[in-house]
């Protein structure tokens, strides 16, 4: 933790480290999306950094978004941002990175993580997508396509990106197509 704290200080970034014991039995029964929902609920209820904020960006823990500063400078704090992971599949939203007003998250997304059932193929992405569709929630693409690198916590998938493909996605994102 000391290395991370040093890095945050040198980067002039506020860092808060939260730790809690989630419901391990329920996470095993329902899957990693359930555990992620528990974590987000804990963060929303206990984070000192979020107390004075109206908006947040969530990035999955093992991933780096190389253009996060560029993205956050362009976000409008009254909007909800998700991308779709694959433009040929518009029936699911990407939960590796999303952003929205905190109250919108608390009201519309935080309560539904309990519907996750990995064994039945119902992942957090499905549950959030269902909320968006059923409630008619207006969602925007990120203003710049996220340059994501890292490793998936569930399947060990390695995420990398190609800059030229991201440039094309940047243009397409302006039309809210991703």
Predicted regions and their residues:
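ER/Golgi luminal nucleotide-sugar-dependent glycosyltransferases, focusing on the catalytic module
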Residues: 1-178
């Amino acid at each position: 933790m000391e290395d991370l704290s040093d890095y945050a200080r040198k980067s002039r970034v506020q860092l808060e480290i939260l730790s809690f014991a989630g419901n391990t039995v329920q996470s095993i029964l329902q899957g990693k999306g359930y555990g992620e929902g528990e974590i987000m609920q804990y963060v929303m209820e206990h984070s000192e950094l979020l107390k004075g904020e109206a908006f947040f960006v969530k990035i999955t823990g093992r991933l780096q978004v190389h253009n996060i500063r560029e993205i956050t400078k362009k976000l409008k704090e009254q909007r909800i941002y998700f991308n779709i992971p694959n433009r040929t599949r518009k029936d699911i939203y990407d939960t590796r990175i999303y952003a929205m007003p905190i109250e919108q998250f608390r009201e519309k997304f935080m309560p539904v993580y309990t519907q996750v059932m990995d064994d039945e193929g119902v992942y957090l992405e499905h549950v959030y997508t269902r909320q968006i569709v059923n409630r008619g929630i207006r969602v925007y693409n990120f203003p710049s396509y996220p340059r994501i690198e890292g490793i998936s916590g569930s399947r060990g998938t390695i995420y990398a990106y190609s800059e030229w493909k991201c440039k094309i996605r940047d243009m397409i994102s302006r039309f809210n197509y991703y």
